[in-house]
């Protein structure tokens, strides 16, 4: 029987420490794909080699586990920041640039400020500090995994609040993603103020 070697979630952070960086933040986003709601980004500086049992890619965790870990991360982090870019900003500057804007806002909240950012994915911009991008970073880096959880939990909670405001769309269930139920509601009720109109163009053209 083949056993997978456990991933050292601190590997990228250790490399950064070895290169002379002391304050290293992980950055990730939640909500790039949905048809409604903002994109959320989080930035987290963890104490070196902090062990948080169950810390892994937020997409693989149950909602309950994510929320539990969110409380642990916010309690244990050296610093963390959470920020949004609105659906209007997404429509104005596109989802990639809006994601970078949310990341920039999240990092600006960190005190002390980070010396290096580890960012999930393979694309970045000039954030005014050194950046290292890591593909699938949310399952390879402790700092990015922590940021992923904070972003997802925060955005999910916001979409649950929007569900109370616009109950006909089912935001509490699908969080704004393009499910059958969501498209059916759009056909019946049309869009609401938190829908991303640039994401709905093809839907309405058809």
Where are these regions (language model features)?
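RNase H-like, Mg2+-dependent phosphodiesterase core
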Residues: 1-206
């Amino acid at each position: 029987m083949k056993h997978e070697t456990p991933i050292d979630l601190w590997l990228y952070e250790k490399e950064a420490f070895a290169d002379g960086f002391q304050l290293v933040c992980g950055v990730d986003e939640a909500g790039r794909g949905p048809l409604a709601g903002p994109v959320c980004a989080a930035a987290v500086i963890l104490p070196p080699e902090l062990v948080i049992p169950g810390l892994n890619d937020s997409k693989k965790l149950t909602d309950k586990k994510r929320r539990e870990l969110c409380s642990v991360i916010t309690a244990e982090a050296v610093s963390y920041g959470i920020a949004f870019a609105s659906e209007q900003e997404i429509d104005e500057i596109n989802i990639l640039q809006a994601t970078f804007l949310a990341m920039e806002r999240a990092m600006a909240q960190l005190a002390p400020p980070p010396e290096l950012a580890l960012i999930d994915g393979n694309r970045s911009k000039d954030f005014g500090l050194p950046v290292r991008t890591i593909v699938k970073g949310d399952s390879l880096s402790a700092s990015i995994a922590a940021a992923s959880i904070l972003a997802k939990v925060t955005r999910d909670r916001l979409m649950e609040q929007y569900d109370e405001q616009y109950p006909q769309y089912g935001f509490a269930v699908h969080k704004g993603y393009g499910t059958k139920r969501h498209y059916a509601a759009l056909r019946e009720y049309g869009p609401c103020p938190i829908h991303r109109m640039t994401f709905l163009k093809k839907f309405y053209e058809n």
